[in-house]
Amino acid sequence: MANERDNKYIDEEEVYNKSLLDQHLLDNDIDAFRDEFLGMHTYEQSEYFEDSDDEIRQRIFEVLSPEEVADFFEQLEFEEEEYDPLFDTMNANYASKVLENMSSDNAVDIMNQLSKQKVASMLTLMNKEDAKEIKALLHYEEDTAGGIMTTEYISLKVTTLVKEALMHVKEQAPDAETIYVIFAVNDHKQLVGVLSLRDLIVAENDAYIEDVMSERVVSANVADDQEDVAQKMRDYDFIAMPVVDYQDHLLGIITIDDILDVMDEEASEDYSRLAGVSDVNAKHDSVFKTAGKRLPWLITLTFLSMITATLIGSFEDTLSKVALLGAFIPIISGMSGNSGTQSLAVSVRKISTGEINEQSKFLVALREAGSGLISGVVCGILLIICIVVLHRQPILATIVGGSLTAAMTVGTLMGAVIPLIMNKLNIDPAVASGPFITTINDIISMLIYFGLATTLMSYLI
């Protein structure tokens, strides 16, 4: 019973038995495998495929049609370097048919991870219409609106009658990414309006599309950054957004499922950078590869930390006179780093969601500095009380408490201001990672602490 439970992959409501599916394939019980596998959700199918070894994957290709494989390939979440080896195990004709049957944007996402030779081979084997469509999309940068759009949408000329439009929608629906939003174009294929399926259904049959459509169209330029597009779609609560070129020609659409992927990707990327690592989602990396990705940041921070160590060493005289000062170094530097990291997270989040503009930058910095000051005063007073009670040294307590207050105030301000400066310079603010801010704040807090201690040394001895 325990073994059976271990072999079950559960996604809240859906349950499938991986071992049983594997056994069906290995026993060549094709009908049983197809019945169970094709009855699963495409997400579960992709999970099963990702968790399978090469032998099982090869059997899957043998018993499923390219159309059936294409359905769950839409959901695959492999690392970039895993796609080439995967396609090496597939027959070239079979692989090209799989890509043909995928939505164009998802097919392009996969092809962007393949070698140029494989892409050229796939395009040669695909039918001309699909190959032409995918070639056009491959020209766009991956992280732009053009890179995530699909060309499978429904558009209507403004001079089309509603009754004709309904027939057109019915014909195009099977291949369209969405039918709920329909775009109106003029004779030059320029975007001039938008209407919903509901608008079309309730309109009079003899009305023209230009009479039904809304001319207030919000669109994305093909070169817009995907993060900006995601923010715009979230602001307007769209399920689909048209993508146009610089002359307003309709090129494609971006749907909400693509935007959810973008938001997840951007959030993971920002989180990775804040943590000082290259990719928190690299679940298949070896320990050596993981270490290799993290070492550049760690080596940089090691050298930055040497500045802190050198700084503390330069105050050797002060430490030799009052050795107890050394006991509070971790508190001062740690709290300064903690407050800076909190402020950094808030600042980066506000920048990424578009909450900060030119007018509000000063207010954000002022608010964070005020928050740091209040937190610093409270923590400083508590620390003063503890030192007085434990060590009976009010002057030392005042120096440590005052340093903590100043360090937390400056640390919080640094955490807020550095991302704002980076954003102003068009540098991703998430690069100002937590470890980086912490190390910078260590240097500043030690300057404050030992500077104040040295200044008031005559009162300590």
Name these PLM-found stretches:
Residues 2-277:
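Hydrophobic packing positions in regular secondary-structure scaffolds
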Residues 302-319, 382-392:
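Juxtamembrane "helix exit" motif at the C-terminal ends of alpha-helical transmembrane segments
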Residues 42, 297-305, 328, 332, ...:
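Alpha-helical transmembrane segments in multi-pass membrane proteins
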Residues 132, 258-290, 341-365, 420-426:
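Non-transmembrane, extramembrane segments of multi-pass ion/lipid transporters
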Residues 284-296, 300, 312, 316, ...:
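Alpha-helical membrane-interface segments at transmembrane helix boundaries
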Residues 388, 450-461:
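Transmembrane alpha-helix termini and helix-breaking/packing motifs in multi-pass membrane transporters
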Residues 314-329, 391-402:
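Membrane-water interface of transmembrane alpha-helices in multipass transporters/channels
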Residues 422-441:
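Interfacial loop-to-transmembrane junctions
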